From Swiss-Prot:
InterPro entries: Chorismate_synth, Chorismate_synth_AroC_sf, Chorismate_synthase_CS
GO molecular function, one term: FMN binding
Keyword NADP: yes
Keyword field: Amino-acid biosynthesis, Aromatic amino acid biosynthesis, FAD, Flavoprotein, FMN, Lyase, NADP
Protein name per its UniProtKB record: Chorismate synthase
Positions bound to FMN: R127, A128, S129, Q249, S250, G294, K309, P310, I311, P312, T313, R335
Keyword Lyase appears in the UniProt entry: yes
Gene name of this polypeptide: aroC
Pfam family, one: Chorismate_synt
Pathway in which this enzyme or protein is active: Metabolic intermediate biosynthesis; chorismate biosynthesis; chorismate from D-erythrose 4-phosphate and phosphoenolpyruvate: step 7/7
Amino acid sequence: MRFLDAGETHGKALIAIIEGFPAHVKIDIENINHLLQLRQRGYGRGKRMEIEKDRVKILSGVRNSFTTGAPITLMIENRDYENWRSFMDATQCDVDTKKVTVPRPGHADLAGCLKYEFDDARNVLERASARETAIRVAVGAVCEELLKMFGIKLYNHVVEIGRVRLTKSYSFDDTELFEQALSSSDLFCIDKEAEMKMKEEIDIAKQIGDSVGGIAEVICKNVPYGIGSHVHWDRKLDAQIAHSVMSIQSVKGVEIGMGFEAARRFGSEVHDEIYYDDKKGFYRKTNNAGGIEGGISNGMDIVVRAAFKPIPTLYKPLKSVDIRTFQPAEAAVERSDICAVPAGSIVMRAAIAYVLANALIERLGGDSAKTMLETFKRIYNKG
């Protein structure tokens, strides 16, 4: 399975085509729209979220709510396009009024202009914008519909904003806690006290014209053993997850399980001891590996965290240089968020769902979900 997406932040629409998705998967379009709505939420989001009300349109590959095995085409229209039509029309438009010649530090602006020989960063930022993640969330939501058939569920929450960390202890089995945070917390945080301090951190950044990043976590439940492989570098499940998550705008680090903390411990404190029970089979009492060993899922929860850097658009701009005159200038200011970590956790969830679905298709054979279920039952003695 693979997908390609296209579209600009102020273009007509965002499009994705998913190829190789199995037939006979029931698609509930409202589940997709629900995740799109969650992506738009979050304390610290910008004015753009007041304009866009993202809803997906399925243009192909699904009939009577079931996938057919044909390429699935998804589209999310950009409402803001009407305000930008005269600047973004594909045939003829005003390219001068919205021209951006002072790149923002931390954004793709300068590197993109140098690579593609542009004198206008608009041609870079329109595609590099995190607006693109809306369609990636839709793709991930479709993949979650497949994963649900095998009992696999994903949960996301925010564990850190700026200098404020979640201190409340929790278990990866606290799924109701994660679900409550999605429905009731502006930051998808399971700890109300920490959430209040996180909001204060965002408020401080807003007051001084700055931005703030953070860390999000995704827990994948009921992933069977044997997904991914050790035999080649590009088939390792953890490598694929890291690749997918690192491709999200603003992500600067990914860790699985204990992650970077493992580098500070002795091996005896890190590796999960193996036990066996006639009823449970092989099991562990700890999950420092985060559900993956040697690039293969081991049957434990897969736990992934990502570090999101602060958004590079600052309302108190940093120093930069005008690419036309080469003279010092303040960085360009585009409409932007102060903090997008909660939204980033939804995108992260989608990125991981895609990897898991693809690995599951490879493991079980992916032309038909019916055949996949039969193979799943045979391998894992389910049902």
